[in-house]
Amino acid sequence: MLKIKSYVKVKSVAEAYELNQKKTAIVLGGMVWLKMGNRNISTAIDLSGLGLDTIQEFDDEFVIGCMTPLRELEINESLNEYTHGAIQESLRHIVGVQFRNCATVGGSIWGRYGF
């Protein structure tokens, strides 16, 4: 069972960083990569109010936020045009659409999932 003592929806990245300095604190996003089992978390840190769930396109780069769902990467027209569909093709095989709607870029990178 997952037990969370305190939940904080942070107002800044600096606040999240400060809270995350404790060993028993954890940043939680979509929570789909969280392993089942017994776990005690002193502080759950929620980044959802920081606007980190966007894909921004500039002249020479894309900026992808850590809270961006994998599904958003999969269906982003500009990103797929630029990569000739490679992003879309690589993501469509990850579990199912409902899962990709919840799984975030940051969680996938942090967990080092190679797909």
Q: Where does each model-flagged region fall?
A:
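C-terminal structural segment of proteins
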Residues: M1-F115
